[in-house]
Structure formats: structure tokens, C-alpha cells
């Protein structure tokens, strides 16, 4: 998934094409874990990295690293745990001194996610994005930079207003409507909108109203 627009890429197809040429694949899945219903091994990639604070709601500072078992021994990180065998993936997690309370939240976050259900959460995220984006996709002056097809996007979308720089749009949304967004200034131009499962349709109605008022001004 592309973070600035929410596009879902056909990773399995890309991995297969790369492997056919003898190329190993590392996937940046920062916005997928806790967002999309999938299993990393099904992608076929050699390496996969993700943030856990984005959609799994773990505190800042926690991440995920997946390495195919036969690839672990070939990796030589700058910092590593020298007490582990070369084929032990735990040597790639050089902890040092850090806030251990973050690690202690990971299991609770996973349990909460599993209680909701991966499929239910993905469906909810896609519903929320469609709820607001379909109300403005054809509205004069508003530009949607995210695909309409459900299989090509989920919770994230990128929206802009003609003639208004993303940073200006983000500032107006915050200052005038108390709505916080992320300004994206290329390669697509707009604001990234990222509701979560607790976002209400009433809140999205306020956002749609704000976008339309700005587009009309």
C-alpha cells in the first residue's frame, strides 16, 4: 500500500516477476499490518518490514521484521546480538536500552486486533473511506487521488482542492474546522485522510461539509 495515496499494489505479482529474474524482494508494508487482511508468507517476499503504531495502535517505536528462514544467516546488520547463531532471527533485533513498556503493549494490541477480526477491520476501514470519498469524488473542484475500485484501496485516501496547495488545504481544515490531515506535496498533491475504526460517520460528514465549503470558496 502506498502511504501517500492508499493505492494497494499487486505485491504477489511483483514478487513473482522479480523472483523470475533472480531478484530478492523487500516489501515496505508500513501501512498494511493491522489494516489489510493478509498473511505475509502468502506474498512470497523474502523480507517484509512494517510499523506497528500505524494501524495496530502500538505506541511509537515498535516495528516488525519478517525474513524468510533461509535468508536469515546471510544478513549482516551493523548492530546485532553476537550471542545468537547466524540462523537465529533474534540476532537481528538488537534491543539495547529502550522503553520496554512499548514492547509490553504489542501482545495486547494483537489480542485487540484479533478480537475485532482482520476481515471485519478491513471491511470497516474500506467502508469509512468509501463513505466520505464517494460524496466528493464528482464534486466540482475536488480531486480524489485514490482509486475508486474497492480492491485497489482501503482506509487511506488522498484528496485535494483545485487551486489550493496541500499545505494550505491542511491548514484551513485544521484552523477552520479542527480537522487534522497530512499534506502531501508530491508526486500526488492533496491531503492524506486516514480514519480509523473508531471514526464515526458523523465526523466524516463534518469533513465532507468542510471540503465542499472550501471547494466553493
Where are these regions (language model features)?
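Pyridoxal 5′-phosphate
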Residues: 1-217
Amino acid at each position: 500500500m502506498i502511504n501517500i495515496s492508499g493505492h494497494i499494489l499487486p505485491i504477489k505479482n511483483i514478487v513473482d516477476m522479480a523472483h523470475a529474474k533472480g531478484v530478492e524482494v523487500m516489501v515496505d508494508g508500513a501501512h498494511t499490518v493491522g489494516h489489510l487482511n493478509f498473511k505475509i508468507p502468502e506474498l512470497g517476499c523474502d523480507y517484509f518490514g512494517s510499523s506497528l503504531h500505524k494501524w495496530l495502535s502500538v505506541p511509537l517505536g515498535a516495528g516488525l521484521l519478517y525474513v524468510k528462514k533461509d535468508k536469515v544467516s546471510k544478513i549482516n546488520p551493523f548492530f546485532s546480538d553476537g550471542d545468537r547463531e547466524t540462523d537465529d532471527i533474534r540476532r537481528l533485533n538488537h534491543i539495547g536500552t529502550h522503553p520496554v513498556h512499548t514492547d509490553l503493549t504489542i501482545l495486547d494490541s494483537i489480542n485487540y486486533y484479533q478480537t475485532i477480526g482482520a476481515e471485519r477491520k478491513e471491511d470497516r476501514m474500506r467502508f469509512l473511506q468509501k463513505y466520505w470519498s464517494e460524496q466528493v469524488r464528482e464534486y466540482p473542484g475536488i480531486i480524489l487521488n485514490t482509486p475508486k475500485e474497492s480492491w485497489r484501496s482501503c482506509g487511506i485516501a488522498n484528496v485535494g482542492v483545485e487551486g489550493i496547495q496541500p499545505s494550505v488545504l491542511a491548514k484551513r481544515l485544521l484552523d477552520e474546522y479542527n480537522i487534522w490531515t497530512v499534506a502531501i506535496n508530491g508526486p500526488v498533491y492533496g491531503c492524506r485522510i486516514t480514519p480509523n475504526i473508531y471514526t464515526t460517520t458523523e465526523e466524516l460528514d463534518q469533513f465532507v461539509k468542510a471540503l465542499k465549503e472550501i471547494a466553493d470558496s
